[in-house]
Amino acid sequence: HFRDAFLARYFIKSGLNLDVMAHRPVVLYINGAFYGVANLREKSDEYYLLHNYGVDPENVDLLEEDTAVVVGDFVAFDSTFQYVMSNDLRLEANFQKAATYFDVENIAEGFIVQSGLNNGDWLHNNTKYWREKTPEARWRYLIFDMDIAMGRHGWSAYHQNNLDSLLTPLAGHNKHVDLFLKLLENDNYRYYFINRYADLFNTIFLPEVFRKEVDQTVAEIDAEMPRHFDRWGWPGYDLWANERIPVLYDYLENRPVYAREDVKDYFGLANEVKLRLQTYPPGAGTIEINTIVPEELPWEGVYFNGVPVELTIKPYPGYQFQHWQSEKTITSPDQTPSIRYNFQEDDEIVAYFSGGPKEPLLSAYINQDRELQLGLTLPNADDVSFSLFDVQGRLLQHFPAAYLPTGYNERNLAIPALPTGVYVLTASGKSTQVGVKFVIAN
């Protein structure tokens, strides 16, 4: 169950809008006897909803496939499902009402990961969905048992069109497919789904990014696997390490090309387009494209002709946004901070800024990983070192100088565990002298 385990963790780590079962690899002993490597994981039941959402197990509908009840009943689902199926969702008012019944972003996310990663053991199986029994609650899907995905069998190979094989044969025969197809009749939702699909394959499903998660998962259990196979036999460590795991790497490397082709074919899109994003001057701001914010600029991603792309700019301190312009599509300056264009061919889009800080600007805070996250905006490039002090001026840690370009720079610094209180971070260079106070709380 390697695939299911590492995908669940990766989805959680990546902040996807999914309800997935967390797991931890363990070495199992029963009455002192070694039973090998196992996955300790959450169970897809009402207590998952209690511990993750605080939902009362006696005040929830948790349903399975088309007719099975885990807890609750089908009364609310049948009513909301009937609304979707009997109304024209091309009308935005009707779609927005449907979106108060169903978490449409969660539904899109589920169809993306299941079809994009070739999990064919879904919709007719391994399908659970839930809603708290409150007026404002919406239906969401649980994601579990994805061990058939990513090349486990021939029909989940990287070249298989799982999007079409999930939707076309089951249309009219499966409530969940019918619900999703009905939502897709709305232009904006269809654009959202396709762009979100592209966003994920431009980021977390890139081979070089995805591979790191496989590497980490293999490394966690590899030392115990020879003993595991000594206990259980087939297929044996050598076959697992030299044939089974390489299938995953081969899948990761090849899947994005076919996944995009699947989307293009299913929705009848004309062609793919490669978009390059950057700011001028560099480091003047961030660009949000659809649902993602690239960590570094310039950045490239693949999207689709026929599906408008949304771009939003956020200036860094000291800069003022002026306009967008591109080589082929946005040929005249567009001064709107948030824009939406259909790109018919490869293009380079630049967000232009004026101004810039006269003096260095520094910010700092403790992030969720308990690292010191800093932002430093420089009027000029410099070799900058950072120093951490307590409020009495005692040096706690020094970080050696490194080159930082003009504009905004963000860094995460590993610091020791420190007690609650106020601290000072300084940045020093040939043309940089700036400090800032920040708070460490419990």
Model-found features: residue ranges?
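Surface-exposed interfaces of beta-sheet-rich extracellular modules
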Residues: H228-F229, P308-Q335
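Conserved "repeat-terminator" motif of extracellular CCP/Sushi domains
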Residues: T336-G356
